[in-house]
Amino acid sequence: MRPIISDYIQNDKRFQELDDVFGHQNILVTGLSPSAKATIIAEKYLKDQKQMLLITNNLYQADKLETDILQYIDHSEVYKYPVQDIMTEEFSTQSPQLMSERVRTLTALAHNKKGLFIVPLNGLKKWLTPFELWKDHQITLRVGEDIDVDEFLNKLVNMGYRRESVVSHIGEFSLRGGIIDIYPLIGQPVRIELFDTEVDSIRDFDVETQRSNDNIEEVSITTASDYVITDDVIQHLQSELKTAYEATRPKIDKSVRNDLKETYESFKLFETTFFDHQLLRRLVAFMYEQPSTLIDYFAKDAIIVADEYNRIKETEKTLTTEVDDFIQNLIESGNGFIGQSFMQYDGFESLLKDYPVTYFTLFTSTMPVQLQHIIKFSCKPVQQFYGQYDIMRSEFQRYVHNDYHIVVLVETETKVERIQSMLNEMHIPTVTNVQNDIKSGQVVVTEGSLSEGFELPYMQLVVITERELFKTKQKKQRKRTKTLSNAEKIKSYQDLNVGDYVVHVHHGVGRYLGVETLEVGDVHRDYIKLQYKGTDQLFVPVDQMDQVQKYVASEDKSPKLNKLGGSEWKKTKAKVQQSVEDIADELIALYKEREMSVGYQYGEDTAEQSAFEMDFPYELTPDQAKSIDEIKGDMERERPMDRLLCGDVGYGKTEVAVRAAFKAVMEGKQVAFLVPTTILAQQHYETLIERMQDFPVQIELISRFRSTKEVKETKEGLKSGYVDIVVGTHKLLGKDIHYKDLGLLIVDEEQRFGVRHKERIKTMKTNVDVLTLTATPIPRTLHMSMLGVRDLSVIETPPENRFPVQTYVLEQNSNFIKEALERELSRDGQVFYLYNRVQSIYEKREQLQMLMPDANIAVAHGQMTERDLEETMLSFINGEFDILVTTTIIETGVDVPNANTLIIEEADRFGLSQLYQLRGRVGRSSRIGYAYFLHSANKVLTETAEERLQAIKEFTELGSGFKIAMRDLNIRGAGNLLGKQQHGFIDSVGFDLYSQMLEEAVNEKRGIKEEEPDAPEVEMELNLDAYLPAEYIQNEQAKIEIYKKLRKVETEEQLFDIKDELIDRFNDYPVEVERLLEMVEIKIHALHAGVTLIKDKGKQIEVSLSTKATEQMNGEELFKQTQPLGRAMKLGVKENRMHVTLTKSKQWLDNLKFLVRCLEGSMVIEDEN
């Protein structure tokens, strides 16, 4: 797209006139619409290739301009400095997404990189680390250079990194021997290997496997925070803070002086080795002798652009008042100090006094600066066609007749062809793939996207987007950010920490106390230490660790510890065994019944199906595409489909269901879409109408929102076959509903229907295809255990244009609430205000009404009648209310794309999984969503609430709070899938053992036998110190992980891989580890040779083989191969089993390795044919 418009604009006289003064003098440019303005600014940047600063009044405008600018400039040259419009969010937990964008911007400026930098006003006014100090903390390491290790590690702490034993999250580093691991805020995790003080190698590594990948010659390490805090900064801070405390104390009410003292003491405790960057940022005004602002980071010849000056001044005024009120509030409550602020108060103009500024405004207005030029553009909006082909034809003909240069932007290559053929049918001449030189009177259809089209009459240029043609929304171009798959995120809830509950398959629930090295009979070995009821303790050898699993159950469930040797655990297991067998019977009966029943077999996709799917304006995620293929595969088989489609809220399940519905309708079948609430019915109905508007599909709705007459007509239409798709609540299950030819039943959230309705659904399943949708995740282990008896499709990846919800945790504060509400309403959005006390919910509404007199505020709670509740919700969805004060009834199933702020009072009283689901209510559109979790000021929190809040603080994409929420939701998902009564059984033995028992029961009932190993496990008793010493691997989780891997080794290649991993992660290994690896090597060959026992008997080693291995041994070959051992080896057969005795000598271990290889090499392998 760029060269086409670009070359045309750069050759235009008006642009050249602007270009001569742009960036050299104070000028005013008027008349341009937002996307035309973005185009002109981008062209100027591309021509000059200098640093350009573009200032907007708020983050929302910055995001909008950025989206358009990214159509012209590569995202590697576009930077944004996102600061929330509510500056007081500086006092809450920061979002890593915004932080990494800020750090990326500051880092680029520190390296004097060219780029277009988009900054909202409050980003420009924010106090920052002095430029030289920031620049001094830009680290680039090269292979071969010397470093001072202590100084380097100290610098990492200054830059906001936390030291851990194993690096698993952004902003962490670790030191193990001569290996430093770092996970920077931007870029891949890196492993730096030192030879003394020289950088020997640099490799990137995978935090999941902890293995390194490619060698790199050099690496730049960005800061992990947008502030640099050194020892000197801390000293200066403590001195300034003391002065501020002494100045504040006499000026506040005596009743809050103790609070002030506590606040002061809590900050005074900080020392450089342990401080929280997130917390210290509140004191930025006291940190530096001379703090900088962003303008100090720019080059002297940077071009400065201000967008909509009057809006910027208005925002500045509001900002100053809000920050003053907020700080004053803090001071008066004993939580803040005089002089505490996070922005400078000089006017916006004085910050830019050293630069000429180009001001863009839509209309001419008076400016406070001396302007050298005013350049007026004439720019018109484009006619909104919205699919009205007659108007479209006449307007395009007008452009062609007037010799305009016409550019039509569409978002995908396939759409280029469709729109070209549509215009050709209207006899409008079109071309595609033109690189430059648009001819007048010609329509160029090309790939690209802007927020809106524009017409520049004097240039005779018009740019038209899909938005004007068909009312579609612009797809956001997202910069690539680091995300982990849900599977990766959930994986680490399995990490064992000291104090965690565990389940031993034979002994029951205990508590994990760590890994201990014990000396038994002069030999050192590692054991897993478990605590049981009373003082009972169990030491499990690490080679039996597969009998120990982490105990996972519902949130906040503390299990009872079992007694060692008691019968209680056996009884518990027997009860669960009976339960899983019953479930397995039920599943298999259902499966057999379904396999035997015959339904309608659909044909392959039709041309209409392809056209319908191409009409979808977004790119499918890989999971969506896979699910669609699985569903179509089921429909094209003879047996009826019964598939569960599981995916998080907003991950695109509906589109998958809609495609299945369309496929059914194209073959003359009817579709029933069953949903649990009237609101959802309405929303799905509207989605279907919008999606299928260009196709001959008759869609109807049966719900309380329809009149009796309409419902009657719909029922008749279903009976006659006139209606293709019907959406409705449980009314669809009524006996008075008759279908002419029902082919597909789609059920949304089946677990929310009553028992009677579920029974009715079950009877309908026998001969029609059924697709069930659920937003509660189904655990992967459970998914695996049900393979072959239940068809599951899982959507784990979010759509591309979904932004992570920005999550903040902070104390209750009415000023802050007012700002958050105002900010959302100012962008024409809506707010969910969660207040979970029905008895005082109307009082809360009155309080909010006083804060926001102009807002329309509604209340929704579970004690309202169903009709009132639904009408309130529908009014909110339709935008009649700005704020909805509600209880947790919004937790599931309401889709309000325009509501993108969620405020939850007393968040510490909710469970994590509940908070996770509530948070899913916002950020459903391409706008950024905000979730504020508030807790009462000065409230003493219980320990669990405190842990929960801590987890919520990490509740961003990569945080552990997510993992806990996912764990809890997984268990809820298991209950939904298998029946609520299973919850108790899952809690009694732990989730993993339950899944394992279910899998075994299902396989046994289906007649699938687990493969018997050819040879039993090798028992090894060698008097060797063979273990992983604590000095070599300090982190116990890492140690357990390595033991687990060694236990699974079956080939020498796998063993070599582990040796590489040990050297890669922990450096060269000591003799004890060498011995451990040798024992594993012996075990590999012994297993293949059918050896059952290797025992150290003091002066000799005894090796025993199984009966089967003895039969398969070629004695002649064995004698030949073992000749080098001579008389050190003796061989005999007793009770049909071969026994080999090896006399111990200095090199006995090498001899033993040689012997087991010979035994393996002398086996006669039976011909499998």
Swiss-Prot record:
Entry keyword Isomerase: no
An individual GO BP term: transcription-coupled nucleotide-excision repair, DNA damage recognition
Binding site for ATP: 647-654
Main location per the UniProt record: cytoplasm
EC number: 3.6.4.-
Compartment list: Cytoplasm
Annotated Helicase C-terminal domain residues: 809-970
Domain of life per record: Bacteria
Motif stretch (DEEQ box): 748-751
PROSITE patterns in the cross-refs: HELICASE_ATP_BIND_1, HELICASE_CTER
Domain named Helicase ATP-binding: residues: 634-795
Top class in the EC scheme: hydrolase
Statement: the UniProt record of this protein carries the keyword Mitochondrion: no
Parts of the chain that traverse the membrane: none
Gene Ontology, cellular component aspect: cytoplasm
One Gene Ontology molecular-function label: ATP binding
Keywords carried by this UniProt record: ATP-binding, Cytoplasm, DNA damage, DNA repair, DNA-binding, Helicase, Hydrolase, Nucleotide-binding
Protein family membership: In the N-terminal section; belongs to the UvrB family.
Function: Couples transcription and DNA repair by recognizing RNA polymerase (RNAP) stalled at DNA lesions. Mediates ATP-dependent release of RNAP and its truncated transcript from the DNA, and recruitment of nucleotide excision repair machinery to the damaged site.
PANTHER family: ATP-DEPENDENT DNA HELICASE HOMOLOG RECG, CHLOROPLASTIC
Protein name from the UniProt record: Transcription-repair-coupling factor
